[in-house]
């Protein structure tokens, strides 16, 4: 390792590690150098030229200089100051300073701050307007007149988000930011991640919700605002008065703009950020370099989809059904009805006749209390959560082989991996921020990406190798690839010898998985499987991600097991960039399971049948607990039909839409004696309820979420609950108290303390350790030490060794002459699942108003149907009517239906789960959502496309490039390097 180098900074010697950014080193010494285009999350862009310093006698940019030799650096002499002023003046030539009436005057305008800190008294070049109008997208707008062409937005779009939409046209007389090949924002391939607005150093790129709302004097009509700007320019002539006045106004804004750190309430990535609110209005979501899962990245939902918070469809009072209709009542009356019926059913039938479904949208603390309510108060283990619908098979596969039911590493490992494998996961739409990390690694650092999926989604289109197996056959090619690796002596023998058991039995089970069998069964040519196997074996590190395309099959547990087997055989656990990543769907589906909202497990995956474990919980709960595992979600519905379940209480779960075969589920909801639903809205499921309780969303409460990488993060209350709605944990406590339980929690932190005392994997978790952007990845030791990478001290079995698990395959998909189409389904980027929350944001609904069905060009030709055709799809269980879009994302007789359908407005007419059946994975009861067939009736042969023509999926042409292409700026005849001005 090279020794430290001596850097002499303004006359003082320092020892600096080789490879350090000079600008970062200068900043670390509390020495000011302006650096307007630089962002620590993106690195040097080199467009603003403000970071001029003298290095060994020569004026150079500090941002792009790496300490790789001893050097003498001066930041203060006259030449340096003159070159910095030249650069700052050139920026003010492009950007008008009217700070006091600017919505961005919130203390973090980097142009304002740089000019103020530098001490610029007056500018040398007059501001010049540009011949362009503002461009408004649905969520953010671009003002060319304020743009300094720093290129941060370009870097974010091209090389961080890797959507590759934004660039700068340097060839114009007046360069500007453009979208695609110079189209308006709303007509471009922009996916509205908002990262451009996040990183913009000024008000050029700004959230629409900020405009006219942030300042005391910014909500005026355009003409009046222009007059105020002119007045401001005269009153603030570029000297210190400008900053004094605007700084005072910025301080005043702090009294009405609240900034609260929270965590996104949508998918399992766990993006954290500050949410800016004024009264009840969400102005802005601002991620941070310190955000552990996402850094500065967001997607359209986390950045902009907050319309549900103030939706006029929010429930603000309890509802009780009387004479077949809902009536608003006070809390006491609703609780009276619940108490009476819960006690009646418990006394008449016993606690086992009540069932409880926890939400994966709620907090850890709330999921914990739901299972505690079920077990302590009612003596029932009939408690579950929506991991039953999606991730239970992945958890099963990991418990079989490595012993923990969670990601083996961190999101960072997916970026570090030499090779990533995506199986049955539409990552770019379901986990977009994770997808961006992998797209960046592939684009900039040469990561190899292999995608196995039946649908050609974005990640498939970007992949180095894309394979399209027949539905439900992933287990076969996985087995064949693993067998090939062993048979050709490519397996990691040292790893297997040191860390893995059951090799002989496992290898014997691979006899079936020949290349010929794999090719015939999967449809993937054996040459492609061999090529994949060889790359997987030789890769320095390999991570495998999978999701619903694997788990929502009737062999989801076995396929998940096969994935882990392959990782063990290639030695891809216990090292950076490797491991198993079952991408969790909801913001807290990992946490809901961690907290014991499952019929056979207490918090921390401790078995209810284990006498020692149960005794521990009995001591804490003060009652004898039921040792018999209860019913899961699927079994609850069967139990209602069989007369074994009389009451169902669920929160934050739209079971009547999201469960499989909702025809069967809806009839159960009609039949159950007493149904309590707790939610933000009168959901489709809530329409069946006897009592509906108004719950508060994440911005209105405190708590914690656990994301897909086992990362525990705090959410903080930003707003008061709307109307009489309450956080779920408070509602559970009210019900428990009505049932006679002594619950007296004052704050969720007390609930977490109780969790930590009972749950070894959370034993070191407390709110103090989760302040700000701090987080912990379980298991967490009592002293707060966590484990970003699992299994470094051995696998989670008694002997510390992993287990290869033998498998077989006899699950052949039989084509049906009547139901001749295979139905695939999944998320769209803009919506989350059924869309109850996302449909409340107007511009999200504008972009994707309804569900639709994707059909292939081949199928369209065969059936003589065209874009906009109205189709009735009929399966063995039900039917759905949808509008078609023709796309090569699907092929042959594969069709694809998004999960969102706005059931609160449209009912279940286009719901995918009208078609799905009741088949399940035999080990977990997870429904086989992806194993659905249907037939088609054509109602109309063509019509209006279901996709808004502005949607990014509709004939958009991205403009990929590397970074901002600053060389084109430097080649312009009007460009002058600030150091050259000094030299002259």
Curated annotation (Swiss-Prot):
Residues 79-119 form the 4Fe-4S His(Cys)3-ligated-type domain. It catalyses: formate + NAD(+) = CO2 + NADH. The keyword Oxidoreductase applies. Its cofactor is [2Fe-2S] cluster; [4Fe-4S] cluster; Mo-bis(molybdopterin guanine dinucleotide). [4Fe-4S] cluster 4 binds at residues 264, 267, 271, 299. Residues 3-79 form the 2Fe-2S ferredoxin-type domain. [4Fe-4S] cluster 3 binds at residues 157, 190, 193, 196. [4Fe-4S] cluster 1 binds at residues 95, 99, 102, 109. Pfam families: Fer2_4, Fer4_7, Molybdop_Fe4S4, Molybdopterin, Molydop_binding, NADH-G_4Fe-4S_3. Residues 252-984 are annotated as: Formate dehydrogenase. Its EC number is 1.17.1.9. The keyword Iron-sulfur applies. GO terms for molecular function: 2 iron, 2 sulfur cluster binding; 4 iron, 4 sulfur cluster binding; formate dehydrogenase (NAD+) activity; metal ion binding; molybdopterin cofactor binding; NADH dehydrogenase activity. One of its GO terms (cellular component) is membrane. Disulfide bonds: none annotated. PROSITE patterns: 2FE2S_FER_2, 4FE4S_FER_1, 4FE4S_FER_2, 4FE4S_HC3, 4FE4S_MOW_BIS_MGD, MOLYBDOPTERIN_PROK_1, MOLYBDOPTERIN_PROK_3. In the C-terminal section; belongs to the prokaryotic molybdopterin-containing oxidoreductase family. This is Putative formate dehydrogenase SH0748. It comes from Staphylococcus haemolyticus (strain JCSC1435). The lineage of its organism: Bacteria, Bacillati, Bacillota, Bacilli, Bacillales.
């Amino acid at each position: 390792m090279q020794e430290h180098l001596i850097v002499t900074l303004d006359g003082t010697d320092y020892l600096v590690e080789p490879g350090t950014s000079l600008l970062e080193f200068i900043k670390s010494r509390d020495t000011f150098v302006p650096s307007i285009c630089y962002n620590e999350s993106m690195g040097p862009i080199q467009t603003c030229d403000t970071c001029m310093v003298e290095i060994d006698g020569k004026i150079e940019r500090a941002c792009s200089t790496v300490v790789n030799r001893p050097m003498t650096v001066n930041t203060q002499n006259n030449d340096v100051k003159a070159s910095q002023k030249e650069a700052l003046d050139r920026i003010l030539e492009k950007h008008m300073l009217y700070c006091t009436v600017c919505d961005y005057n919130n203390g973090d305008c980097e142009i304002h701050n740089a000019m103020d800190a530098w001490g610029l008294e007056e500018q040398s070049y007059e501001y010049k307007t540009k011949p362009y109008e503002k461009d408004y997208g649905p969520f953010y707008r671009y003002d060319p007149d304020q743009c300094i062409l720093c290129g941060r937005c370009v870097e974010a779009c091209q090389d961080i988000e890797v959507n590759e939409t934004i660039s700068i046209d340097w060839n114009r007389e007046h360069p500007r930011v453009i979208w695609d090949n110079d189209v308006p924002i709303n007509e471009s391939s922009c996916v509205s991640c908002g990262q451009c607005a996040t990183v913009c150093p000024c008000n050029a790129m700004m959230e629409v919700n900020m405009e006219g709302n942030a300042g005391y004097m910014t909500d005026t009509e355009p003409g009046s605002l222009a007059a105020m700007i002119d007045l401001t320019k005269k009153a603030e002539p570029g000297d210190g008065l400008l900053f004094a006045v605007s700084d005072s106004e910025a301080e005043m804004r702090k009294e009405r703009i609240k900034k609260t750190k929270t965590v996104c309430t949508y998918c399992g990535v766990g993006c954290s950020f500050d949410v800016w609110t004024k009264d009840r209005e969400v102005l802005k979501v601002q991620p941070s370099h310190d955000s552990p899962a996402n850094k500065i990245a967001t997607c359209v939902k986390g950045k902009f989809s907050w319309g549900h918070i103030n939706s006029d469809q929010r429930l603000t009072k309890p509802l009780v059904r009387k004479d077949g209709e809902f009536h608003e009542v006070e809390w006491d009356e609703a609780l009276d009805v619940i108490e009476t019926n819960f006690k009646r059913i418990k006394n008449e039938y016993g606690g086992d006749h009540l069932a409880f479904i926890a939400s994966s949208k709620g907090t850890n603390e709330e999921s914990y209390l739901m299972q505690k309510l079920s077990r302590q108060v009612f003596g029932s283990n009939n408690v579950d959560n929506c991991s039953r619908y999606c991730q239970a098979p992945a958890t099963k596969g990991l418990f079989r082989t490595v012993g923990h039911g969670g990601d083996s590493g961190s999101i960072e490992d997916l970026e570090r991996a030499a090779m990533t494998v995506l199986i049955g996961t539409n990552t770019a739409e379901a986990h977009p921020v994770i997808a961006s990390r992998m797209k960046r690694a592939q684009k900039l650092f040469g990561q190899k990406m292999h995608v196995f999926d039946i649908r050609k989604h974005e990640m498939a289109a970007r992949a180095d190798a894309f394979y399209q197996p027949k539905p439900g056959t992933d287990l076969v090619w996985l087995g064949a690839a693993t067998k090939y690796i062993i048979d050709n002596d490519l397996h990691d023998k040292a790893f297997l010898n040191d860390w893995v058991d059951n090799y002989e039995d496992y290898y014997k089970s691979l006899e079936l998985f020949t290349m010929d069998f794999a090719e015939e069964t999967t449809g993937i040519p054996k040459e492609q499987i061999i090529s994949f196997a060889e790359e997987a074996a030789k890769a320095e590190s390999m991570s495998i991600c999978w999701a619903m395309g694997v788990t929502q099959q009737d062999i989801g547990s076995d396929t998940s097991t096969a994935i882990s087997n392959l990782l063990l055989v290639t030695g891809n656990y216990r090292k950076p960039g490797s491991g198993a990543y079952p991408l969790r769907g909801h913001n807290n589906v990992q946490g809901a399971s961690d907290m014991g909202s499952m019929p056979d497990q207490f918090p921390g995956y401790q078995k209810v049948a284990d006498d020692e474990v149960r005794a521990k919980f009995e001591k804490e709960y003060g009652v004898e607990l039921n040792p018999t595992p209860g019913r899961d979600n699927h079994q609850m519905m069967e139990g209602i039909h069989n007369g074994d379940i009389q009451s169902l209480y669920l929160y934050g779960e739209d079971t009547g839409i999201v469960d499989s075969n909702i025809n069967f589920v809806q009839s159960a909801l009609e039949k159950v004696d007493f149904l309590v639903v707790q939610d933000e809205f009168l959901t489709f499921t809530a329409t069946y309820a006897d009592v509906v309780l108004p719950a508060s969303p994440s911005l209105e409460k405190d708590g914690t979420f656990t994301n897909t990488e086992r990362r525990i993060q705090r959410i903080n209350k930003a707003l008061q609950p709307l109307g009489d709605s309450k956080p779920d944990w408070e509602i559970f406590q009210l019900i428990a108290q009505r049932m006679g339980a002594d619950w007296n929690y004052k704050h969720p932190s007390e609930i977490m303390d109780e969790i930590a005392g009972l749950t070894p994997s959370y034993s070191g978790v407390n709110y103090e350790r989760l302040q700000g952007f701090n987080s912990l990845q379980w298991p967490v030791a009592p002293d707060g030490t966590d484990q970003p990478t699992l299994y470094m001290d051995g696998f989670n079995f008694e002997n510390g060794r992993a287990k290869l698990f033998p498998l077989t395959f006899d699950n052949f998909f039989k084509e049906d002459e009547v139901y001749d189409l295979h139905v695939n389904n999944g998320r769209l980027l803009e919506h989350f699942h059924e869309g109850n929350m996302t449909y409340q944001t107007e511009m999200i609904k504008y972009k994707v108003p309804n569900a639709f069905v994707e059909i292939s060009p081949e199928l369209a030709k065969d059936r003589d149907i065209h874009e906009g055709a109205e189709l009735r799809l009929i399966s063995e269980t039900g039917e759905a009517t949808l509008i078609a879009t023709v796309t090569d994302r699907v092929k042959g007789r594969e069709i694809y239906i998004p999960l969102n359908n706005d059931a609160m407005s449209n009912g279940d007419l286009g719901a995918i789960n009208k078609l799905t059946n009741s088949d399940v994975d035999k080990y977990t009861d997870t429904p086989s959502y992806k194993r659905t067939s249907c037939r088609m009736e054509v109602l109309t042969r063509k019509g209006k496309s279901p996709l808004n023509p502005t949607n990014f999926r509709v004939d958009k042409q991205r403009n990929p490039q590397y970074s901002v292409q600053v060389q084109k700026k430097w080649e312009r005849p009007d460009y002058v390097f600030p150091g050259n001005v000094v030299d002259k």
